Design a protein with these regions (language model features):
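An acidic/histidine-cluster motif and surrounding catalytic segment
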Residues: 1-110, 119-156
Length: 156
């Protein structure tokens, strides 16, 4: 798995923790081991530009996902497809505000948003209530299991 992290924000982060989380989620979702993913962290003005350009919505957002080869989660007994999973753009300043409101660390919020972004790249969505329930339960399970395996007690 090739996972590139480009930090263009002022936020100091543990890139290895982001990469470990991404690898864990991709592994659990049975993404091909040679799949590529790019994580980019940007400041609020850069995220706002992307949000307006791609979603036609004002202001910065927390996470945006840009799928490339439209890979889907692997199925038992089938070889997963190779390819580029896509790009995930995270905005640490927005994540920090959300983390404060939720009562947990910014780093945990970024891991949550990363997990959310990977699920979007794999075709999950939350436009409908049943889709939202499925996606949010899956992202919570994936993240809490990842954090527990690393000895973290999540405040999520």
């Amino acid at each position: 798995m090739s996972i590139d992290v480009l930090n263009e924000s002022d936020f100091a982060l543990d890139e290895m923790e982001l990469v470990a989380c991404a690898k864990y989620v991709m592994g659990e979702m049975k993404v091909h081991p040679q799949a590529d993913l790019c994580l980019k962290l940007v400041d609020a003005p850069a995220m706002e530009v992307l949000h307006v350009q791609w979603m036609d919505l004002p202001g910065p957002t927390d996470v945006m996902s840009f799928p490339m080869d439209e890979l889907r989660p692997g199925r038992d007994g089938q070889e997963p497809a190779e390819g580029v999973l896509g790009d995930i753009v995270l905005c640490p300043s927005v994540a920090g505000r959300q983390a404060l409101d939720a009562g947990h660390a910014t780093e945990e919020e970024l891991l949550l948003l990363l997990t959310h972004g990977i699920l979007h790249l794999l075709g999950y969505d939350h436009a409908e209530p049943d889709e939202e329930r499925e996606m949010f339960e899956l992202q919570r399970t994936l993240l809490l299991t990842f954090l527990a395996g690393r000895g973290h007690r999540a405040g999520l």
